[in-house]
Amino acid sequence: MGNTFGHLFRITTFGESHGGGVGVVIDGCPPRLEISESDIQYDLDRRRPGQSKITTPRHESDTCEIISGVFEGKTLGTPIAILVRNKDQRSQDYDEMSVKLRPSHADATYEAKYGIRNWQGGGRSSARETIGRVAAGAIAKKILKQVANVEIIGYVKRIKDLEGMVDPSTVTLENVESNIVRCPDPEMAEKMIDLIDQTRRNKDSIGGVVECVARNIPKGLGQPVFDKLEADLAKGVMSLPASKGFEIGSGFAGTLLTGSEHNDEFYLDETGEIRTTTNRSGGIQGGISNGENIIIRVAFKPTATIGKEQKTVTNTGEETTLAAKGRHDPCVLPRAVPMVEAMVALVLCDHLLRQEGQCGLF
């Protein structure tokens, strides 16, 4: 239960961190879309471990295999299965964690819910589960780009108390990928890298905020009342490992304004389209896209598994301590960027198909 996401563009992820592999089954992808492993691999490479000194040193190529649903380079309209095999597991690093519960990790809650857990690498609660999401998100991005020229760009906005200055209306993928922390503010990026590296040497971890902008969004996406577009975006990104907060548009800062200060006033552009002079709504009003840029922010906590000794208990109820072994990210933010993009793409693609199905016939 709980492994499937979406309505018309529907994904089910599978696999564990130290199992044979991880992947996704996509149902509802339109037929005749040109797709190949290379379309998917680019985003998987951005997500994969071992890519820099500020990420986990686990070495995985994360090479994807399309198992079904594609023939002669085009989608068939049938379920698409994508598999990535695990190759660099070091399960012995987790022997101690078979008994000791990691503070603030899913160990204790999985044990409480199921009465059993895969302690090798965190099993299903590992961030390797997101490989399937990123693979499916790459296909969703291609649909959105081809149908509506939608562009989705995520980037690191903040690491701990270091915040970059980024204009979401002009930021490019090249700006984001110009450094290993994926912050488009070059000066702040260097400070972030130094802070993460120092935290790693201290056997600790830090968190931060990923901001994501979706541009060229068609008007009308979103389903009132329980499937509002921002509600589904929040559900999507808040289902990512280590996510702890969600904002759209002005977010919590909007509570400091009056209505006259916060309202996005309307005007007619040169083509007669209704536009807004500001975008404090973040591109969504009444749960439905208004055609402006959708801008969201996702807060990620510090990585739970750290090398510093902490107090904990065993699964048999004895107090003890744990200094975790294994290979872990000192900060999840650089690798979380393509994960956030993927969830945004999945939500927007699903709602695009729903909009066409309900309102696009007449």
Swiss-Prot record:
Q: Name one GO molecular function term.
A: FMN binding
**PROSITE patterns for this protein:** CHORISMATE_SYNTHASE_1 (PS00787), CHORISMATE_SYNTHASE_2 (PS00788), CHORISMATE_SYNTHASE_3 (PS00789)
Annotated cofactor note: Reduced FMN (FMNH(2)).
Annotated residues that bind NADP(+) are located at R47
Q: List the disulfide bonds.
A: none
- Tell me the keywords, alphabetical order: Amino-acid biosynthesis, Aromatic amino acid biosynthesis, FAD, Flavoprotein, FMN, Lyase, NADP
Protein's name in the database: Chorismate synthase
Provenance organism: Rippkaea orientalis (strain PCC 8801 / RF-1)
Gene that produces this protein: aroC
